[in-house]
A protein has these predicted regions:
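Extended, charged alpha/beta regions that create polyanion-binding interfaces
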Residues: 439-441
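Signature of N-terminal electron-transfer/Fe-S-associated modules in redox systems
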Residues: 321-414, 418-426, 433-437
Length: 443
């Protein structure tokens, strides 16, 4: 966005070995419905933007950490070449957010191994290829907790329960259906973990019902044997660098205070995405990035700032179990677009009729969900270079065949290099679907 707006030089600094941020480990689908009008995995979405930066001539510094940012826009960096400073005409902060750690919770017990955030577990499994445990309890039902419940199940672990202290889940309704109900994983609302058991390694946890004041109710304690406790208890905007520069932080969101052009309280320093506030969808983060990049380029060139207005109305997807009656509810939550229609399907003499859908695609999806449900399978494959490569089926496959298909995929080893979209396995399991690569990798 900054380059397109006329910036002479744009430098993108990334502390990881590759651009893309958290998207690299978000191998599941559901991204891009707003931005690209199609459903992508996280790596696919990230690679599209990576390619755009190359095409625009953006200089990318990977494996580079920013250690300091001053109010006059001097950026201090360090990488394998040493420590250096960049004097910028404008700076855009896009560091994202971090997970709320165990230290922010009131968990009794020792500090054994096996307690980790859901994002850490996601990186272990999807990037490193390590299984952090076999018997899992998840505290918190945000989307990453729900997604990791499914991911761990696909990899052969047993998810004993997802515990949520509130009356409803903060996760998307479609994730509750596809990540929990698809695999019969119990969601324990108004429950929290009161104690962690084990010294060297987690051996189990005690959970309890909470009252209206979110206090554990005496006599409702229940012990669950497990070797891993995953925490999905909220996200906090990353703001340590910004504080050094003197950027004002909102006391409620913990994010940066910005104006309509995403300029912070420090002139020439802009912020976008999850450093401002935690967003539901990456598509909205991208929109904010475009706004901030354009405004930063205008500021650097001394041009007046013109506020960007995005034409598309932002539609938040439905959240929580409140959109579901019970597990015998005949209604289907449609996932073909962000609206998430609640569609009732009824059998009639000549087939099926639907009620509640806004389009023909929703009608077709709902009938398919009732008669022969399908899912797009997303997972990883090992490579000859020890890297884990994200893959997916190029079309939905029968839900009941997913376990069988996982076994086929896990028996294979990929040879690098490989490119985005390359077919790895044709007609896997006789489903008519091909397994394709969702991120390019060189040797």
């Amino acid at each position: 966005s900054a380059k397109k707006a006329g910036a002479q030089k744009v430098v993108l600094i990334e502390r990881d070995e590759r651009a893309g941020g958290i998207l690299q480990q978000c191998i599941h689908n559901g991204f891009g419905l707003h931005k690209f009008k199609e459903e992508l995995t996280g790596p696919e979405y990230g690679e599209r933007y990576e390619q755009m930066t190359f095409e625009e001539g953006v200089q990318l510094l990977t494996d580079t950490t920013v250690t300091d940012l001053s109010r006059d826009r001097i950026v201090t960096c360090i990488n394998e070449t040493g420590c250096f400073k960049i004097k910028a005409e404008a700076v855009v902060l896009a560091m994202g957010c971090r997970e709320r750690p165990r230290g922010a919770l009131n968990l009794a017990g020792d500090r054994p191994s096996g307690v980790m955030t859901a994002g850490t577990a996601q990186k272990f499994v999807n990037i490193k290829g390590y299984m952090p445990g076999r018997k899992i309890v998840i505290l918190g039902s945000g989307d990453i907790g729900l997604i990791m419940a499914r991911r761990m199940t696909l990899e052969g672990a047993e998810v004993k329960a997802v515990c949520e202290i509130m009356k409803d889940s903060g996760g998307l309704t479609r994730n509750i259906v596809q990540c929990l109900r698809d695999f019969d994983i119990p969601l324990r609302l108004r429950h929290t973990v009161t104690q962690v058991h084990g010294r060297e390694r987690v051996e189990g946890v005690t959970i309890a019902l909470v009252d209206e004041m979110l206090r554990p109710v005496e006599g409702t304690e229940e012990y669950i044997e497990c070797d891993t406790l995953m925490l999905s208890v909220g996200l906090i905007p990353e703001n340590e660098l910004s504080k050094k520069a003197g950027v004002e932080i909102d006391p409620k969101t913990k994010g940066h205070v910005v104006d309509e052009n995403r300029q912070t309280t420090c002139e020439g320093i802009f912020a976008c995405g999850n450093v401002v506030k935690v967003h539901e969808l990456v598509d909205f983060v991208s929109e904010e990035g475009e706004t901030a990049g354009y405004a930063a380029a205008c500021y650097a060139a001394g041009r007046p700032l013109e506020t960007i207005h995005h034409s598309e109305k932002r539609i938040s997807e439905k959240k929580g179990v409140k959109n579901l009656a019970d597990e015998t509810d005949p209604a289907v939550i449609c996932t073909v677009c962000p609206i998430g229609c609640r569609i009732k399907v009824e059998r009639v003499k000549d087939g099926y009729v639907t009620e509640g859908n806004n389009c023909k695609r929703g009608e077709a999806y709902a009938i398919k969900e009732v008669t022969s449900p399908e899912r797009t399978l997303t997972t990883i494959m090992a490579s000859d270079c020890k890297k884990m490569i994200p893959v997916k089926t190029d079309r939905p496959v029968p839900k009941e065949k997913i376990e069988e298909l996982m076994k086929i995929i896990n028996e294979k080893t990929l040879l690098l290099p490989i490119s985005l979209g390359d077919i790895i396995i044709e007609n896997i399991g006789g489903t008519g679907a091909n397994v394709v690569c969702t991120r390019s990798f060189n040797i």
